[in-house]
Structure formats: structure tokens, C-alpha cells
């Protein structure tokens, strides 16, 4: 570190005035002190000059060292550039070699694709031929089923016609029975009404005759009693007449008046009594007869109500029969429509199953062929690559780079192969699930599996175990 300066700048430049005193005015001691200070400053300046000179030499030395290092680095950089140019030239040569190899590989790949397409065309033709044969057999089965369906429809029509005739006969028989029962009930109750009316008339006449006889007897008895009373009174008056004629005459007159009044009153009383009796007893009997008639009338009304209810039930039964006929016709139409829909669904379902089975079988075959071709191509490429590596005599660095690239290519190819295997497993699983669903639907519709006309083929990849879950959840094949 450079030493610090002491003193003032004004003193270094000149001592025109030193401590407020001119040099010529200083004393000897002051001049000596001033000289000592100047010497100290001179020594200090020398030390600083030496320090800065050392610093300059050190910096110059560092600069020389740095310049030499820079020249060395530039030389190394030029060497690296030359090495990079040489490596680029070698890389271009390797690229040309690999491009030539890739051309050969593409040519072989195109040849393999042409072979695969040819094989696929042959397989497609065979599948189409088999499909035509199956279609002919299915059409033949459909014709047989249509004939059977027509025969069944004719048999059903005959059965329905017989049922209708039988039903019409039963309805006619029931109507005749109801009409006969109605006529019998009407005749029965008309006869009962006539008998009841005759009986009531006879009873009324008999009771009237009995009342007349009873009233006539009462009138005769009453007249006889009156005659006896009159005879007694007459004898009494005759006895009195013997004693007192005047009294008798007066009594006769009174008696005559009394007799007339009595006769008049008796006649009125007899008439009133007769009228009361004649009215009271017939009224009572009439009330009893009326209650009896009301009871019988109630029975008759109840019978009439039963008859009306029977007629109403007959009408309701006829209406229900008519409704049942209409519902029977509707159900027949719906049955025919459901049968047609069932046949159509069965036909579509069978066609869809056959189409899916053919597609999945063909797709499985194509995928297996692709896998075999890819495996063969990979093995062939490995052999060619080993031959090329053996013949090229590359350095270890380039060989490592090429090996790494080849491993990447092989890894991508293996990934493609695994994806294809997974797709094949998923398609096989979907096909098998579709077969299970198809069998379940056939059993739900009541169609035995033996009547399908063909045996569904379950697909499986050789050497692989497929998952047992749904087709969308197929695990990676093992």
C-alpha cells in the first residue's frame, strides 16, 4: 500500500509564506525546521515513486503473462477449429454412408410392404369368398324361416278364426240364455201378480160379505132389543094408564116424542156406528193389505231391479266382449309387429356379428402378419448392422454414437410392436365381449344358441393372455 502524504500542497510548490512568515524573515531555527520538513517530504515522495515503480513493473509482468496465455489459448482454439473441421468431414462421410444404408433399407421395406399388400389381397379374396358362401347359406336359412313363419301365421289365423267362431257361438248362447231367463222371470212375476190380484179381490169380497152379514146381525139384534124395550115401556105405560089417563096421555105424547127422538138418535147412532165400523175395520184391513202389498210390491220392485241389473250386466258383458274383441285384434297386430321387429333385429344382429367377426379375424391376421414381418425385418437389420460395424472399423467414439442411435431406433420399433400387440389384444377382447353380449341377447329373446346356424369363433393371440375386464380396459399383453 502506498504511504500517505503529510503536509499541505502549498508547501510543496513553494514557500513564499511559511507558517505566516516570509523566508527572509525566518530565524535560523525556523529555517532548519523548514528544511527538515522538506527533506521528510522528499523522502516520502521517493518512497512513493519507488512503490509506484514496483507496481508498474508488477502490472507489466502480469500483462506479459496474460498475453502469452492469450496466444496459447488462440493456438489451442485454432487447433480445436482444425479438429472440428476434421470431425465435420468425418461426420459428413458417415452421414453419406448411413444415407446409402437407409436407401437400401427403404428399398427392402418397400419390397416387404408390397409382399404384405399382396398377401393381404389374397387373404381379402379368401375372406370375401367365404363371406359369399356364408351369405348364401344365411339367405337359404332366411327363406326357410320365412316359409316357416308364413305357415305359422296361417296356423295362427286358423286358430284365431276358430276362436272367433267359438266366441261368437258362446256369445249367442249366453244372449239366448239371458233372454230366456228374462222371459221366464217376466212370465213368473206376471203370473204371481195376477194370482196376487185375484187373491186380494177374493179376500176383499169375502171380508165385505162377512162385514155385511155381521152388521146385519147387529142391526137385527138391536132392533129386537128396541122392540123388547118398547114392549116393556108399553106395558109399563098401560099399567100407568090404568091409574092416570091424563098422565098416560101426557106421557104418551112425551113417549112418542122421546121414541121419535130415540129412533132418530138410534138410527143416527146405528148409521154412525155402522159407518165407523164399516170404515174402521176395512181401514185396518186395508192398512194390513197395504203393508202386505207394499212388501210384495217391494219384492216385485226388487225383482224388477234384479232384472234391470241383469240386463245392465248383460249390456256391460256385451260391451266388455266387444272391447275384448277389439283388444284381441290390437294384440294380434302388435304380436305380428313384434314378431317382424324380432326377425328384423335377429337378422341385423346376426349380420353385425358376422361382419364384426370377419373384420376382427381379418384384422388379427393382418396384425399378426405385420408383427411377424416387423420381427423378421428387425432381425435382418440387426444382422446387417453388425456386418456394417464389422466392416467399417469405426473408432470407439463414433461406434458408441452409432450404437446409441441404433438403440433409440430399436426402442422406438419395440414400442411400435408393443402398441400393435396391445391393439391386437384389445380387438380380440372386444370381439370376445361382443360374442358374450350376443349370446346373452339371444338367451334374453328366447333363441337357443344351437339355432343360430353358425358357431361363433373366439379369437386369441398365440402366446398371450388377455385381460378379463371390459374391452376398453385391456391390460398390456403378457
Swiss-Prot record:
Q: Name one GO biological process term.
A: protein localization
Q: Which residues form the signal peptide?
A: none
Q: Which UniProt keywords apply?
A: Cell projection, Cilium, Coiled coil, Cytoplasm, Cytoskeleton, Flagellum, Golgi apparatus, Microtubule
Q: Region Interaction with SMO: what ranges?
A: 357-478
Per the record, the coiled-coil ranges are 24-201, 243-427
Localization per Swiss-Prot or TrEMBL? Cytoplasm; Cytoplasm, Cytoskeleton; Cell projection, Cilium, Flagellum; Cytoplasm, Cytoskeleton, Cilium axoneme
Query: Which Pfam families does the annotation name?
Result: GAS
State a GO cellular component annotated for this protein.
microtubule cytoskeleton
Instruction: State where composition is biased (Basic residues).
Output: 1-12
Per the record, which residues fall in region Disordered? 1-32
Q: Which GO terms describe its molecular function?
A: microtubule binding; small GTPase binding
Q: Where is this region: Regulates microtubule-binding?
A: 1-114
Chain intervals for the UniProt region annotation (Microtubule-binding): 115-258
Checking PANTHER family in the record gives: DYNEIN REGULATORY COMPLEX SUBUNIT 4
* Role played: Component of the nexin-dynein regulatory complex (N-DRC), a key regulator of ciliary/flagellar motility which maintains the alignment and integrity of the distal axoneme and regulates microtubule sliding in motile axonemes. Plays an important role in the assembly of the N-DRC linker. Plays dual roles at both the primary (or non-motile) cilia to regulate hedgehog signaling and in motile cilia to coordinate cilia movement. Required for proper motile cilia functioning.
- Oligomeric and partner information: Component of the nexin-dynein regulatory complex (N-DRC). Interacts with microtubules. Interacts with SMO. Interacts (via coiled-coil domains) with RAB3B (in GTP-bound form). Interacts with DRC1. Interacts with DRC7.
Which protein family is it in? Belongs to the DRC4 family.
Protein name as it appears in the record: Dynein regulatory complex subunit 4
The organism encoding this protein is: Rattus norvegicus
Q: What is the lineage of its organism?
A: Eukaryota, Metazoa, Chordata, Craniata, Vertebrata
Amino acid at each position: 500500500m502506498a504511504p500517505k502524504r503529510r503536509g499541505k500542497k502549498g508547501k510543496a510548490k513553494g514557500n513564499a509564506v511559511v507558517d505566516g512568515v516570509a523566508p527572509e524573515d525566518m530565524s535560523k531555527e525556523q529555517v532548519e525546521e523548514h528544511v527538515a520538513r522538506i527533506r521528510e517530504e522528499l523522502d516520502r515522495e521517493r518512497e512513493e515513486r519507488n512503490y509506484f515503480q514496483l507496481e508498474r513493473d508488477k502490472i507489466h509482468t502480469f500483462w506479459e503473462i496474460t498475453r502469452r496465455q492469450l496466444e496459447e489459448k488462440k493456438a489451442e482454439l485454432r487447433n480445436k477449429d482444425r479438429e472440428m473441421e476434421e470431425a465435420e468431414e468425418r461426420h459428413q462421410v458417415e452421414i453419406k454412408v448411413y444415407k446409402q444404408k437407409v436407401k437400401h433399407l427403404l428399398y427392402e421395406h418397400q419390397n416387404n410392404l408390397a409382399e404384405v399388400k399382396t398377401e393381404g389381397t389374397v387373404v381379402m379374396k379368401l375372406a370375401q369368398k367365404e363371406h359369399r358362401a356364408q351369405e348364401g347359406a344365411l339367405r337359404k336359412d332366411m327363406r326357410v324361416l320365412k316359409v316357416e313363419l308364413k305357415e305359422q301365421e296361417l296356423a295362427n289365423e286358423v286358430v284365431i278364426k276358430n276362436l272367433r267362431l267359438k266366441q261368437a257361438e258362446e256369445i249367442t248362447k249366453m244372449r239366448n240364455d239371458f233372454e230366456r231367463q228374462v222371459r221366464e222371470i217376466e212370465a213368473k212375476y206376471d203370473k204371481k201378480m195376477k194370482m196376487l190380484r185375484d187373491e186380494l179381490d177374493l179376500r176383499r169380497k169375502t171380508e165385505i160379505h162377512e162385514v155385511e152379514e155381521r152388521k146385519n146381525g147387529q142391526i137385527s139384534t138391536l132392533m129386537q132389543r128396541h122392540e123388547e124395550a118398547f114392549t116393556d115401556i108399553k106395558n109399563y105405560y098401560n099399567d100407568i094408564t090404568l091409574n092416570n089417563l091424563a098422565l098416560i096421555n101426557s106421557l104418551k105424547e112425551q113417549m112418542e116424542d122421546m121414541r121419535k127422538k130415540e129412533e132418530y138418535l138410534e138410527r143416527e147412532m146405528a148409521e154412525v156406528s155402522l159407518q165407523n165400523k164399516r170404515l174402521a175395520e176395512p181401514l185396518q184391513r186395508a192398512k194390513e193389505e197395504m203393508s202386505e202389498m207394499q212388501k210384495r210390491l217391494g219384492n216385485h220392485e226388487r225383482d224388477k231391479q234384479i232384472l234391470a241389473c241383469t240386463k245392465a250386466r248383460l249390456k256391460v258383458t256385451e260391451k266388455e266382449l266387444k272391447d275384448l274383441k277389439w283388444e284381441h285384434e290390437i294384440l294380434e297386430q302388435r304380436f305380428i309387429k313384434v314378431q317382424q321387429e324380432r326377425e328384423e333385429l335377429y337378422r341385423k344382429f346376426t349380420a353385425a356379428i358376422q361382419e364384426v367377426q370377419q373384420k376382427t379375424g381379418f384384422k388379427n391376421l393382418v396384425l399378426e402378419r405385420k408383427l411377424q414381418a416387423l420381427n423378421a425385418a428387425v432381425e435382418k437389420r440387426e444382422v446387417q448392422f453388425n456386418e456394417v460395424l464389422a466392416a467399417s472399423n469405426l473408432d470407439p467414439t463414433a461406434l458408441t454414437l452409432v450404437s446409441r442411435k441404433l438403440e433409440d431406433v430399436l426402442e422406438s420399433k419395440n414400442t411400435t410392436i408393443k402398441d400393435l400387440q396391445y391393439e391386437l389384444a384389445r380387438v380380440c377382447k372386444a370381439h370376445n365381449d361382443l360374442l358374450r353380449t350376443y349370446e346373452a341377447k339371444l338367451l334374453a329373446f328366447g333363441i337357443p344358441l344351437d339355432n343360430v346356424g353358425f358357431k361363433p369363433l373366439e379369437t386369441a393371440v398365440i402366446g398371450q393372455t388377455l385381460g378379463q375386464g371390459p374391452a376398453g380396459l385391456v391390460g398390456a399383453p403378457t
